[in-house]
Amino acid sequence: MGFTVVSRSGSPTRRENQKRRVCFRLLLRLLRRGFVVLSAESDPKMPNYSIRGINVEFPFEAYQSQIIYMDRVIESLQNKCHALLESPTGTGKTLCLLCATLAWRKSLGSFSTRKDRKNSAIPWSDSDEPLSQSGGGGGGAFPTIVYASRTHSQLRQVIKELKRSSYRPKMVVLGSREQLCVNEEVNSLRGKALTNACQYLCKKRGKRQCNHFNRLPDYLKHNPHIGDEPVDIEDLVNIGKDSGPCPYYITRELHKDVDIIFAPYNYLISNGYRKFLKVNWTNSVLIFDEAHNLESLCADSASFDLPSVLLSACISEAQECVQLAAARRDSLNDVSINPENFAILKGLLLKLQELISKVPIPKRDEGFTKPGPYIYEMLKSLNITHETAPKLIGTVEEAAVFLEEEKQRTATNAGSKLEIIADMLKLIFRENGSNHADVYRVHVQELEQNSTDVMKGKVSRTLSWWCFSPGITMLDIAQKGVGSIILTSGTLSPMDSLAQELKLDFPIRLENPHVISSNQLWAGVVSTGPSGYVLNSSYRNRDVPEYKQELGNAIVNFSRVVPEGLLIFFPSYYLMDSCITFWKNGCYRNSMTVWERICKLKKPVIEPKDSSLFPAAMRDFSEKLQDRATSGVVFFAVCRGKVSEGLDFADGAGRAVVITGLPYARVTDPRVKLKREFLDEQSQLADVKLPRSTLLSGSMWYSQEAARAVNQAIGRVIRHRHDYGAIIFCDDRFEQPSQQSKISLWIRPNVKCYSRYGEVISDLARFFRTERSNFPARLVTEQENNIVSTLLPVESIEDNPTPAFGNSNLKNVGVAQNELSRLEAFPPANRASPLERDGNNVKRNGLTILKHTGKIPRIVKGDVMQGCSSRKAKLVELSDDEETPVERRCEVVDLESDNCETQTCVTEVLASSTCLNTMGLKKKRKVPESQGSASSSVLTAKGNGGGDKKEASASAFLSQVKEKLNTEEYKKFIGYMQALKKKEIKLANVMQSIVQLFCGSERDHLLMGFKDFVPVKYRPAYEECIKTRKRQSIIFGNSN
């Protein structure tokens, strides 16, 4: 499908040619950007699916797995029950989740946006009360949806997905002051320092005030539409900078009356943040995206560690408060703050420090452990109880604010450590806190001396109160009367243990398959290396030189056969550093080291342990990946590290992932050891009626945690429907059925165990040869190619590449129409006449730009077909007895380019640039004019003779192809043609790929039509490809 230009009859004048040139330049610009203009009457609606009685609008033709996923979401919402939904990355789960949830919500009543409320039967007027006066609850009687993800980076991607849908609920995204503050006076502060400074400036009685906060009421009054369209953190910050209101307090006011709230996890799992939310929790819907780490996050949010260094800092701050308060009382007669309260606080902290130092620790490795309720005994000896704790917390918070005000006055940016003591006490003495103490353990650990510690020369101890049942957090949430809690991720399995850990009943569960075909994935267990030495990274074997040498040699060979990006995941930083050091320093006479051999094949990048260095490592990876002088990049990373968590290594960024071992947690770690003991105790105390298989023992948890980390790492490859890659398990323990059963469901059927290393390399090489011919390198934008932009954990933007309307979407249509409307802003050199509108078309002096209709009209004899230049142009000639143009090569200079490279004319953009001429559609040599103008056609079907026939027209066939294929499939088709033209793949492989692409009852005419462009001698082979493919479709089912 393309753009068609029709001019009035008669010879064009020079002025008309210049006007046309402007139009063509715009059309070419839009074509290059991928915009297609649709006429208003032909705008197709999004596909509409009726799922459990709910009409769900989906922006694409949904795969069967996506429909099943949306069905489970709606079932959970309708039945007010909880759900565990696993769907591999690249299957479009975020978009499915949004569309299904919002369709269900819309079925209950209109959204709270001005547009929907005006169109609904619910009374609404512009004089609604301000948000600050409205009750929480997402528009009153309707349930509020809270969509939570781990980071704002992930939420940014979710909001992008929302923009792709047709749903426009009233929404808000919540963020911290650090992300939203636009007050230059304080936004350089961090943490509690920024919070206290903000609260101080927003006090009405304060001498200094925040102007952004003061502008908030007027802005909300005159902009009630805010949140009607999807807005992100960056959008809110720009509003604050441009219009003046405080973005942070915009979100605080707005979240009280919206349909859906987007927020990081801590707004739900932290009791303090939950209290901040003014939401009617009754029947609300809570969605946890990327929930594979939810149990550990819940446990961490309910635990604390108090190292002696931090406690000493708090004591120093308390002493500072005593001195400042006494000085203010003496010099200013200010008696509002009593220094004696701060002296009492200091005394209690000193006693706590002494109490911790006297705890008996027989063995440093084991530490001191007591049941959870012991924390109340310790604090009771300091007279800190449920009765006295509130007053003490008030004193701590008063000291922190007082100290912050002083630091503001002296321009000191350091935050107060005392706030941590307040948070610790709130956690211990929270509502019903003692009832939960049984799932805690008190632990005091003696740490090795650190030369940077304030307590240098003294014993450093840490008091910990660890929660071993993350379910207490989820139970607190569920007891608020929420309707449904939906947990989704690409790696939730095994689900039984997850449900048991979270202490909730999840009657709805789903383990979705991937949308890719099985031939797009290679998965194998490599038990031995090139020389036959067993690959096993267990604790006993990991430091053996022979193992490191064998693993290094294996990676060298993988680097040789895996194209582009290769990801290597180690169980720990220790093992990664140990192996790399060995490979660099090994003694090799008259030969290169293992590291040198790896570097010769691929440029290395190593994941840093310091998270602050991670962005630089990603930039390094991106630059090396884009360097065409290299054969690829190898990224050495760690399971549970940043590389394994949510990064998008799509296409060439990650063609294979190597798992070098099982990432078991350190068995001697006190927290791991106590967690295993806790689960074993709980299993023994469990109801004897429960089947033992459903009980989670310590060893089961230990093994499953390692399996989840593996599944997260291998999820970095295969990021969308048309991606392909390999997963290589380099540890013989993966041969065990017990280990393979923990691998994600969609991978398991593909896993093959190899006993000989040579077979691995030959199979891998064959796999990549086949897939590179089946999936030629797709055209990627600069943004897609920049891996640094994917530092954020994201769902691939190509989760579902099957658009409902050709290769465009409504957003692109709007942009293209805006571009057309601005055409008069780009006048030609001789000032052409302004644009005229004729229905859905655009005119300029008789030149008509037709909106896209799905057909390519005939070009009238005498039309000028030219690109960006009027200096070189030729007429498209027509013989007297035909309508089809006889096209000649037009050498056209693009005036927009600096080097004025020659380009094809518009007709070749619509036809020959598709590379169809490489498949039998080729340029014929120039023949004498006496042989007739028809014989001078540049596009002729081989063996068909009738180049003038409509069926053989490249433009007509291209139009049919574009109409039936989705965007990604069409790109593949173009890629095949381009690869064939460059002789990168063989004709036989192209025919097989085309048959696979065109297979399907609705595409049979494409299979037959393409045969016209196949050289005669290859047609029998092409027909055999068709027969073979159809037999496979009958036996195995059509993959398309």
Swiss-Prot record:
Pfam families: ARCH_RTEL1, DEAD_2, Helicase_C_2
GO cellular component labels: mitochondrion; nucleus
Polar residues bias (residue ranges): 930-939
Xref: Gene3D superfamilies: 1.20.1160.20, P-loop containing nucleotide triphosphate hydrolases
The EC number(s) this enzyme carries: 5.6.2.-
CDD domains the record matches: DEAHc_FancJ (cd17970), HN_RTEL1 (cd13932), SF2_C_XPD (cd18788)
Catalytic activity from the UniProt record: ATP + H2O = ADP + phosphate + H(+)
Gene knockout outcome: Increased homologous recombination and replication defects. Growth inhibition due to defective cell proliferation. Hypersensitivity to DNA cross-link agents. Loss of 45S rDNA repeats.
Enzyme class: isomerase
Residue ranges of the region described as Disordered: 117-137, 926-949
Source organism superkingdom: Eukaryota
GO biological process, alphabetically ordered: DNA recombination; DNA repair; DNA replication; interstrand cross-link repair; maintenance of rDNA; mismatch repair involved in maintenance of fidelity involved in DNA-dependent DNA replication; negative regulation of DNA recombination; pollen development
Signal listed as a keyword: no
Ligand binding ([4Fe-4S] cluster): C181, C202, C210, C246
Motif (DEAH box): 289-292
Matches recorded under SMART domains: DEXDc (SM00487), DEXDc2 (SM00488), HELICc2 (SM00491)
Family: Belongs to the helicase family. RAD3/XPD subfamily.
Listed PANTHER family: DNA REPAIR DEAD HELICASE RAD3/XP-D SUBFAMILY MEMBER, REGULATOR OF TELOMERE ELONGATION HELICASE 1
Domain notes for this protein: The PIP-box (PCNA interacting peptide) motif mediates the interaction with PCNA and localization to replication foci.
Annotated protein name in UniProt: Regulator of telomere elongation helicase 1 homolog
Gene (name only): RTEL1
